């Protein structure tokens, strides 16, 4: 493995993995393969849809101790807290996370299969192994892409009345369209979709707190695409 080779050649080097979107998808995490540190976001997979903010760092005792001293102060480390409100939603979300991630993966597999049947390219395919919760779907036309995102937004629990339109988002060379009617802003473990407005007009869908909601959202997205004349169902 890469980690073993790295540690043998450079014993003082620490290997860090950004595992955002990947937690609880596979049977083993990067730390099982020798990563010294893994980091990610608590408003994504490991927060289970309940964590309101924050990120996490896990790793070897030596690595975490060094990080803690840098974060706070030497000698203090982890002896001080970081969130005054309450840690309950973080721990409860972590408890729920494996199940919630499973719901998101089932939603992604369903989306992949549905759009494969409609003749579109999906990555990964419905029957391919997965390492994260992201599902890419090549919509091929801008009209189809926008209609899909609008349908996902219409099925959202928050701001379902909003209709996403492409806009000039800072940091991107192309216009971007986003559907994200989530309880927690930026929580990609909740069902959302986004895409740059460029060929092949690929939608990146992720999340889904429940498989039931994922199925409803996909149905509404297909309906929106048909209503807008972007898709014809035989």
What is each stretch, according to the model?
Residues 116-233:
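Conserved C-terminal alpha-helix-loop-beta "cap" of PLP-dependent enzymes
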Residues 2, 26, 63, 67, ...:
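General structural feature for long, well-ordered alpha-helical segments within catalytic domains
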Residues 1-102, 106, 115, 119-122, ...:
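Conserved PLP-enzyme active-site core in the AAT-like
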């Amino acid at each position: 493995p890469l980690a073993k080779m790295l540690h043998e050649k450079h014993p003082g080097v620490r290997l860090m993995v950004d595992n955002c979107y990947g937690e609880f998808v596979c049977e083993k995490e990067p730390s099982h393969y020798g990563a010294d540190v893994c980091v990610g976001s608590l408003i994504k997979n490991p927060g289970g849809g309940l964590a309101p903010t924050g990120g996490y760092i896990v790793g070897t005792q030596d690595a975490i101790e060094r990080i803690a001293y840098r974060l706070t102060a030497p000698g203090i480390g982890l002896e001080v807290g970081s969130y005054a409100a309450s840690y309950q939603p973080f721990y409860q979300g972590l408890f729920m996370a494996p199940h919630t991630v499973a719901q998101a993966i089932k939603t992604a597999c369903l989306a992949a299969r549905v759009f494969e049947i409609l003749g579109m390219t999906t990555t990964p395919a419905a029957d391919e192994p997965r390492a994260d919760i992201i599902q890419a779907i090549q919509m091929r036309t801008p009209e189809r892409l926008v209609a899909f995102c609008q349908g996902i937004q219409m099925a959202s629990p928050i701001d379902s009345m909003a209709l996403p339109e492409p806009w000039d988002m800072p940091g991107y060379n192309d216009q971007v369209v986003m559907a994200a009617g989530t309880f927690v802003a930026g929580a990609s473990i909740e069902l959302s979709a986004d895409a740059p407005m460029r060929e092949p007009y690929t939608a990146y869908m992720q999340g889904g707190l429940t498989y039931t909601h994922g199925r409803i959202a996909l149905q509404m997205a297909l309906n929106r695409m048909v209503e807008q004349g972007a898709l014809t169902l035989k």
